[in-house]
Amino acid sequence: MPAEKTHLAICNLTKEQYPQIKTLMDQAYPGLGGAWPSHTIFRLIDQFPEGQIGIVDDGVLVGIALSVQVDYGRFSNPHTYEDIVDGHDRVFSDPEGDALYGLDVVISSTHRGMRLGRRLYDARKELCRQYNLRAILAGGRIPRYYNHSAEMTPMEYIEKVDHKELYDPILSFQLSNDFQVKRLLKK
């Protein structure tokens, strides 16, 4: 879709947008269970509304970024995904937290290649400045690692992606947004 024909705006997600959120997540994660249940998204919106960011194109949701506030001391150290998200049923957010934890970024397949993910990350960075948060933390999948798992370790794969010898849609995106890999998370 040509950029000059779009009417994009950043917004905070609302509960009324859940059907559109569900559609985006179902498209992005068909093999991983699809969208989180409505009560989980509603809890995120209730607990930390500013951290649930969307991009709309002429009123249609085309991208989302979900986040929670966490304690930097706890989550900058080894932890598991389940320490943040309990089976997509409960998400733990700490209103006194001093860091932002990025849970997810999803862009509609019709709007990829328009740097919307970067716009969502920029909105997260601005939120950190506004709240004087210490950092953005995130755990990310390396979805194309399975193609190379017989010939290299996950850390070797990460190094090759970092040196642009390999491309991984999630890790390459995070690295291009100035994130640094600190460690591998256990399942």
Which residues does each PLM region occupy?
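Short amphipathic alpha-helices and their capping/turn segments at secondary-structure boundaries
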Residues: D57, G87-F92, D122-L133
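Short alpha-helix
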Residues: Y167-N177
